[in-house]
Regions:
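Motif-centric detector for short Cys/His coordination patterns
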Residues: 1-79
Length: 79
C-alpha cells in the first residue's frame, strides 16, 4: 500500500498588531504571532503605516509598501 503526503499551503487572510506583536490570521482560522522585534522596519513604522498592508498573491505573504517589508507565511511558520 502506498501513501502520499498532501501538502496544504497556509494562506494569510488578515493581519493585526498588538503593542509588541505581529499577528497573522490564516485561512484555516489558526493565528501566528511573532514579536515586532523580529521586524525592525515594522517596529519603527507608525500604526497607520503598519495597517497599510496587502496580501501577496492568494495570501502566501504580506507586503507593506510604505515600510518596504515583505513577510511570508512560510517564514513565520518556520520560526
Amino acid at each position: 500500500m502506498s501513501t502520499s503526503a498532501v501538502r496544504v499551503e497556509a494562506l494569510a487572510v488578515d493581519v493585526t498588531f498588538t503593542e509588541h506583536n505581529l499577528r497573522v490570521v490564516l485561512a484555516d482560522g489558526c493565528e501566528i504571532s511573532a514579536p515586532l522585534e523580529w521586524f525592525p522596519r515594522l517596529k519603527a513604522a507608525t500604526p497607520e503605516k503598519r495597517t497599510n498592508w496587502r496580501l501577496i498573491g492568494p495570501g502566501v505573504g504580506v507586503h507593506w509598501e510604505e515600510v518596504d517589508e515583505d513577510i511570508s507565511v512560510e517564514s513565520l511558520l518556520a520560526a
